[in-house]
Amino acid sequence: MKKWRHKLSRALLIGILGCAILPVFLSCQGPEKIALPAGPEAAYKTIAIIGHRGAAGLAPENTLAAFARACEIGVDAVELDVLLTADNEVVVHHDFNLNPEITRSKNGKWLEDSSSRAINNLTLAELKTYDVGRLRPQSPYARRYPEQKAADGQRIPTLREVICLLKQQCHKPIELWIEIKTTPETPGLTPPPETVSEMVVKILHEENISDRARILSFDWRNLVHVQKIAPEIPTVYLSLEGVSLNNIKSGQSGASPWMAGLDIDDFAGSIPRAIQAAGGRYWAPYYKQVTADQIQKAHQLGIQVFVWAPDSPSAMQRLIEMGVDGIITNRPDILKSIIKRSSSELSKP
């Protein structure tokens, strides 16, 4: 463990210093795009490994430490979440507010209440005063990620900082999967989707990484807009029919505000058909809300399926056998081991 921490700390230091010496307007140059696995029927050797929030099961989510860890593992892509600050900086953070389960103030104390600390009400300089490098003991997050290693001193990074680190620290070119966080149900919590998506696309173009990036969102308005302003960037349609978030709203009167004007009931409840109508080719459902039949039908429509976010070996294996094209996971190390072992067994005479 000490050896791993030493290697990671040195890699992070090199990456951060390398990025810090470049002016903000100067791009880090990266290698060429690689093609993620594709095909109508997924096999072990063609499953895309996408690190969720970097590698949140192993290092603090959405931090440079997590993305460096994902690079070390050798993922095909990293997934991250973006929001806009009060001074219009694109930062990498999952929640609309600072999360008390992972956030400490500059005096080292855990946040007690996030209600007055919305990301869009804080400047980048203010956000950089918070430490997000450790899980709060006994918190739900701590129970969710028992293997996560603390990395004290980690700050909320900007999208540009993550891009720079990936270009400098990954041994192979990987894809960048950016989830844009906006909500139609509480519009004051974020700027309009057009504003955020345009800023993200602008950064991708300036950093010369748009050819190996994908845009994800539960708010399909972002995806439809990206398809108009940057059709070369693939869009990935997220879906969840849960209690705290339901962007599909099957059986409810009228179109879901999340689905860019589409009503799922007009498509007999078929999310792949709705995605096709929106102009999409990639679907990312919650892994517990997809069946082998749905995956097969999505493939018949030319839509690839990338599930999120199973972390147990049994769930990963089951999903691979169901035919998914890729898995977004907090434990890319486990997924890589499963694929390596299974591919080796399949290659035996």
What are these model-predicted stretches?
Residues 1-7:
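N-terminal secretory signal peptides that target proteins for export/translocation
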